[in-house]
Amino acid sequence: NPVIKNPGLRDFRDPKVMWYEPQKKWIMSLATKNNVTFYSSPDLKKWIKESDFGDGRGAHGGGWECPDLITLDDSGKQRWVLIVSLNPGGPNMGSATQYFVGDFDGKTFTSSQTATQWIDYGPDNYAGITWSNTGNRKIFIGWMSNWLYANLVPTEKWRNAMTLPRDLKLKHVGENIYLTSQPVSELSAIQSKPVTVHNVKVTASTDLSSKTGGVKFPCQLTLDMEEVKDFRLVLSNTAGEELIIGYDKKQNQYFIDRTKSGKTDFQKDFANRHVAPRLSDNGKMDISLIIDVSSVELFADEGLSAMTEIFFPNKPYTQIRLESGSNIVIKTMEYIALSAYN
């Protein structure tokens, strides 16, 4: 296997290779300390260094890893997106994955993006990459953990998992362009018949478990709201433990709070409340949650805001309730059990 000689860097790693059709050559994206270095080759044997990207761009709390250069459609125009993981330096501590929207000419990647953008604001989605040979789709999967505690989580016979595969797309909000992510449509293969409830009025606290005929994990729970208001979705068990997922209108942030979620004392930063900005300017709100026995993946506003979290309750969560001081109305609530273990 031909390899590129390391020029003397400690971090010279994670090659991702793609075919660049306009110039009939292969492009390799390589993590090189705090940058991504691009190499090209006509035959996968002889490689030429083309350029570096990273100085003064994005987050640099730690070394860059797992680069992935992809193209996505933007209303008929092709745009380039560079996905880069780093550890530490994430938006909610520890490891995380950022992205840059820009252009690539076969030699140099450029981006006018000034703010750091994250593919997932939760603490537990890292080192993700996309598949090849998926047609016009770009499908992404990440490692569902964080290097802050990956080797400390209280599990037996297994340690950590992967996120759901996600379809990546681009979406404009005002003058900004963002990368969205939503569960792949193939998830329908393990979905049961949906339980749909309309016009759910929520005052102080409303039990959703009774409205769905009981709760079984894993499941998919979707909420569509006509107004953007504060809410808290609480998963709880008979041990008094709870995981809280919600939206804070004043801060314009989604959040997941696992402070009292169960086993949390194995690492000092695990018990925490994590936040993600609401990027949408729509006056309506939609939220889709994939909830398993020890993880939740949140996709809000058609995937503009995403969060992934793991948790370790001492007893299974069996109840779901919705709380709000704003008298919200859930226009449509859909609960779907997933048969992943069958």
Protein language model features and the residues they cover:
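Short, solvent-exposed loop/turn segments at conserved positions within beta-propeller repeat blades
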Residues: 30-34, 91-96, 159
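Beta-rich accessory regions
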Residues: 75, 103-342
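Short glycine/acidic-enriched loop and turn motifs that connect beta-strands
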Residues: 34-35, 87-90, 147-148
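Conserved Ser/Thr-centered positions that define the repeating blades of beta-propeller domains
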Residues: 38-44
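Hydrophobic beta-strand segments that make up the repeating blades of beta-propeller
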Residues: 26-30, 80-83
